[in-house]
Amino acid sequence: MAAEPTIDALGQFRLHHGLGPIGGLVNFTQSNEIMVLGTAIVLGIIALGMRQRAVVPGRLQSLVEISYNFIMGLCIEQIGHEGKKFFPFIFTLFFFVLMGNLLGLFPYFFTYTSHVAVTGGLAVLVIVLVTAVALRYHGLHFFSYFFPPGAPKALAPIIVPIEIISYLSRPVSLSIRLFANMVAGHVMFEVFATFMFLLIGALGTFGYFAALLPMTLNVTLVGFELLVAFLQAYVFAILTCIYLHDAVHLH
């Protein structure tokens, strides 16, 4: 008697070594494989799109130019003229997150942004960069950021710890927001997909008709997850720009 399908919504997030014995030797997982693939896709599109640099751009060149203008505009709008210096970092960060979100929507691919180790690592990188930029621009005066101008000095023992906790909570909120959104979407995919097979197995021919509802929900969810993939990459990038603005202008 065949075992009935069960819902294992979190099984898709388990890591395993890719590349056979070599992958196990260097601890190279399917998460790393998708990171490499995503990076190769972005670099390939940029290289192909800008190869000819035509006056009348083709589709790939237009895509690259739109991406460049979008991220550059984001940097300048949020950080100011100094934002141009941080364009390479924001551009890389945005597309690294975006590719992790998008590639995971394909069957047999892995969403590396669904692991808090990845999103947490990115968030720590952001906060370290922001702190380094603030110290580079303002030196020890950076620490005045934790005590707003005009605040009563008597409240310093209360305000300073609150501001420090608020500052240190930035990488936590950055990482959990992205991680939680990616996990939630893929768990819903798995639940609805497994539910379709459960209905077919339990109800026979009638189950095919009953499975239309969860199938329709899954198709709708794909469109929603596409939107979420872009939105979460944008949120991660714009919050990084806002933090860099605070570091540059100290307010």
Swiss-Prot record:
Bridged cysteine pairs (disulfide): none
Membrane-spanning intervals of the chain: 28-48, 63-80, 86-106, 115-135, 154-176, 195-215, 219-239
CDD domains recorded: ATP-synt_Fo_a_6
Any Pfam family the entry gives: ATP-synt_A
Membrane protein topology class: Multi-pass membrane protein
Keyword vocabulary terms for this entry: ATP synthesis, Cell inner membrane, Cell membrane, CF(0), Hydrogen ion transport, Ion transport, Membrane, Transmembrane, Transmembrane helix, Transport
GO cellular component: plasma membrane; proton-transporting ATP synthase complex
Record's subunit section: F-type ATPases have 2 components, CF(1) - the catalytic core - and CF(0) - the membrane proton channel. CF(1) has five subunits: alpha(3), beta(3), gamma(1), delta(1), epsilon(1). CF(0) has three main subunits: a(1), b(2) and c(9-12). The alpha and beta chains form an alternating ring which encloses part of the gamma chain. CF(1) is attached to CF(0) by a central stalk formed by the gamma and epsilon chains, while a peripheral stalk is formed by the delta and b chains.
Assigned protein family: Belongs to the ATPase A chain family.
Official protein name in the record: ATP synthase subunit a
